[in-house]
Amino acid sequence: MSLNFLDFEQPIAELEAKIDSLTAVSRQDEKLDINLDEEVQRLREKSVELTRKIFSDLGAWQIAQLARHPRRPYTLDYIANIFTDFEELAGDRAYADDKAIVGGIARLDGRPVMIIGHQKGRETKEKIRRNFGMPAPEGYRKALRLMEMAERFKLPIITFIDTPGAYPGVGAEERGQSEAIARNLREMSRLNVPIVCTVIGEGGSGGALAIGVGDKVNMLQYSTYSVISPEGCASILWKSADKAPLAAEAMGITAHRLKELKMIDSVIPEPLGGAHRDYLAIAASLKAQLLADLSDLDVLNDEELLNRRYQRLMNYGYC
């Protein structure tokens, strides 16, 4: 799988290109007198050290780029690697089935759960079909339908957040985009089942919050959560999207900063180089966090669960 190196990773990309070149030469001519294996191993170790050095000092804008990485695992990737017996459920029973939201029933270590998440696309056709992960009102109404179903059957709800924001098109506004988001916020605050939310990529504004009201809210190490994109903020404050790196630092969009502000509960470590480097490793880490969170919430009765969730919402903004 191509790693699609970002701009700040170019020194790593150059080393990896050398490794690939030497490996190809070694395979083509096994009768070479020089030992390329040792050189390849040396370069691999150097690449790991360089990656560790670069990733030990990432800025908010670099993390924002990682959150949008084209090879980053999406909701369906986590479903495939964490859950079993997934049965997708479609439609909002009112207008349409929005492919930017996926959801359904699955098992987490044998336990039935309801999964809901944003889904972006990788290839052009899929990106268009998924609307680049930007849900319309019918997507959020589908999500609410599945949440209400989960409450009826006493299933914990697990959500995966990864969207640049709710779709801002005219049709979406005409069909009640703001109402759909607001209704989800209200209804999620009073569902009588545990809710665990995880930001796996971009957490963009109300489009993220509409499936982000939970008893536990986690973020992957290189994900972001904000009321507006850095480019949008820069365009408003400095009249130029070129100031996005400055805006990203000022906005406090990273997982560790939001943990400091008590906006989230846990930061889930990613493999060296980001989640796209090792799907199985990040899936294992996320699964462990989900199991731990559900174990913590299982001991609470309905009243305790709702009171705790209410207090959590009321404490936002107080540090």
Curated annotation (Swiss-Prot):
Pathway: Lipid metabolism; malonyl-CoA biosynthesis; malonyl-CoA from acetyl-CoA: step 1/1. It comes from Yersinia enterocolitica serotype O:8 / biotype 1B (strain NCTC 13174 / 8081). It catalyses: N(6)-carboxybiotinyl-L-lysyl-[protein] + acetyl-CoA = N(6)-biotinyl-L-lysyl-[protein] + malonyl-CoA. It is an enzyme of class 2 (transferase). It holds the Pfam family ACCA. Acetyl-CoA carboxylase is a heterohexamer composed of biotin carboxyl carrier protein (AccB), biotin carboxylase (AccC) and two subunits each of ACCase subunit alpha (AccA) and ACCase subunit beta (AccD). Belongs to the AccA family. GO terms for biological process: fatty acid biosynthetic process; malonyl-CoA biosynthetic process. InterPro entries: Acetyl_CoA_COase_a_su, ClpP/crotonase-like_dom_sf, COA_CT_C. Component of the acetyl coenzyme A carboxylase (ACC) complex. First, biotin carboxylase catalyzes the carboxylation of biotin on its carrier protein (BCCP) and then the CO(2) group is transferred by the carboxyltransferase to acetyl-CoA to form malonyl-CoA. This is Acetyl-coenzyme A carboxylase carboxyl transferase subunit alpha. Keywords: ATP-binding, Cytoplasm, Fatty acid biosynthesis, Fatty acid metabolism, Lipid biosynthesis, Lipid metabolism, Nucleotide-binding, Transferase. Its EC number is 2.1.3.15. GO terms for cellular component: acetyl-CoA carboxylase complex.
